[in-house]
Design a protein with these regions (language model features):
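Amphipathic alpha-helical assembly/interaction segments
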Residues: 1-122
Length: 122
């Protein structure tokens, strides 16, 4: 079975891209010991979600697509773990963190749904 999915047409890819952009902005605000390492890990985890969804689409088969979705799901779980480690010094940052957490949970649900129901063949 050949899969011809376009990541730019998948809602999960759009949401993951927005989360990655917001994570980059958040990471720039980190201060204190280990700030760079924490920010870098958060950014790499969010970028991995987007990248693995795109790579899975490019592989061309449903089994490969699903394999990369599992990797993306693991990276989304890592993103949640990194977000739990962030201390929010301001109400604005608290709101930003909550938004990132909520959207990351949404990504996890969307990946699970997409795994169970991959895009149709073209």
């Amino acid at each position: 079975m050949v899969l011809r999915a376009d990541p730019s047409r998948l809602l999960v890819s759009e949401v993951a891209t927005a989360v990655a952009r917001d994570a980059v902005a958040l990471a720039k605000t980190f201060r204190g010991p280990g700030a760079f390492a924490r920010g870098d890990q958060l950014v790499r985890a969010t970028l991995s979600v987007v990248s693995n969804i795109a790579e899975g689409c490019g592989r061309g088969t449903v089994p490969e697509f699903r394999r990369f979705l599992l990797i993306a799901r693991g990276s989304a779980q890592e993103t949640l773990a990194q977000l739990r480690l962030v201390d929010a010094p301001s109400p604005a940052q608290t709101s930003q963190l909550q938004s990132l957490r909520t959207r990351t949970v949404l990504i996890l649900k969307m990946i699970s749904r997409l795994y169970a129901h991959p895009p149709p063949d073209k």
